[in-house]
Regions:
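Short gly/pro/ser/thr-enriched loop/turn and capping motifs at secondary-structure boundaries
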Residues: 29-31, 49-51, 73, 101, ...
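Anionic-ligand-binding alpha/beta catalytic cores of soluble enzymes and soluble regulatory domains
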Residues: 91-140
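Long, charged alpha-helical interface segments
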Residues: 129-131, 136-210
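Short phosphate-binding loop-to-helix
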Residues: 65-87
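A glycine-rich helix N-cap at a beta->alpha junction
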Residues: 60-68, 121-125, 147-155
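Short coil/turn segments at beta-strand junctions that form active-site/ligand-binding loops
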Residues: 1-2, 20, 88-91, 122
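N-terminal beta-strand-loop-alpha-helix module at the start
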Residues: 1-57
Length: 210
C-alpha cells in the first residue's frame, strides 16, 4: 500500500519524508517546492497564491487539480477524496493540519465525519512534532504507543459508553462518566484496548513542548 504525505496549510515546522508520493494542498505546494520535495499532485482552489505562484506550482507538479473556490469540501477533504479514489489502499499522513485558523484545524481533526472519508479513517493520520491523531471506528481496537509520546486522549464521536482498558486510567461500565474528551491518559506496559460502541473515536497522542 502506498504511503502518501499530504501537506496542508497549517504550521509545517516538523515533517518526515519517507513516503512514496507527496501531495500539496493550495499554498502548501510552495512549501514543498521550498523544501525540494516533489509534488506528485497539487489540489486546491489556490485562492491564497498569486498567479505567478500558481504557474510555478503547475509547472512543478506532476498533476494539478484546480477546484472552484465555492464548494462543499475543504481543499484538504477534496485532496483526501482524490487520493483514495486513485489509491484506495493508501496510508495518508497529513502535515500542517494544526496551527493557523482554528476553523481549519477543527475541520482537519474531524475529517472522517465526512461519509466519503469515514471508510478510510484507519488509514489517515495527522501529525506534527508534538501530536499524532489517529481514528478508530466502531469495534474493539488495540492502540499502540507512538515512540516519544507521553499522553493519550480519547474523543468519542457517537453515542453509548466508550471503554478504555489497559491504560493508567481505565474507563468501564463500573466507573463510566461522560466527557467530550478523556484527556491526559497514559500507557502503562503495553497497548491500550478501546471499545467503541458506535461512531468513531479520535485518539490523540501528545507530549509536552520541549
Amino acid at each position: 500500500m502506498p504511503k502518501i504525505a499530504l501537506f496542508v496549510g497549517g504550521e509545517l515546522e516538523w515533517f518526515t519524508t519517507d513516503f512514496d508520493y507527496f501531495v500539496g494542498v493550495d499554498r502548501a505546494c510552495l512549501r514543498l517546492l521550498e523544501l525540494g520535495l516533489p509534488i506528485d499532485l497539487a489540489v486546491g482552489d489556490f485562492d491564497s497564491v498569486s498567479r505567478s505562484e500558481l504557474e510555478m506550482i503547475q509547472s512543478a507538479a506532476k498533476d494539478c487539480m484546480i477546484a472552484p473556490a465555492e464548494k462543499d469540501d475543504t481543499d484538504t477533504e477534496l485532496a483526501l477524496k482524490i487520493i483514495f479514489q486513485l489509491y484506495p489502499e493508501a496510508e495518508v499522513t497529513i502535515f500542517g493540519a494544526f496551527g493557523g485558523r482554528i476553523d481549519h484545524m477543527l475541520s482537519n481533526i474531524f475529517l472522517v465525519s465526512d461519509p466519503e472519508l469515514a471508510p478510510f479513517m484507519r488509514r489517515i493520520c495527522l501529525r506534527d512534532k508534538q501530536n499524532k491523531i489517529t481514528y478508530y471506528p466502531e469495534g474493539s481496537h488495540k492502540v499502540l504507543q507512538e515512540p516519544g509520546m507521553t499522553y493519550v486522549s480519547f474523543l468519542h464521536e457517537g453515542d453509548g459508553e466508550l471503554t478504555i482498558l489497559g491504560a493508567k486510567y481505565e474507563l468501564t461500565s463500573m466507573n463510566y462518566f461522560q466527557k467530550k474528551i478523556y484527556s491526559s491518559n497514559e500507557f502503562i506496559d503495553g497497548p491500550i484496548q478501546v471499545l467503541v460502541p458506535n461512531g468513531y473515536v479520535i485518539v490523540i497522542q501528545t507530549k509536552d513542548r520541549s
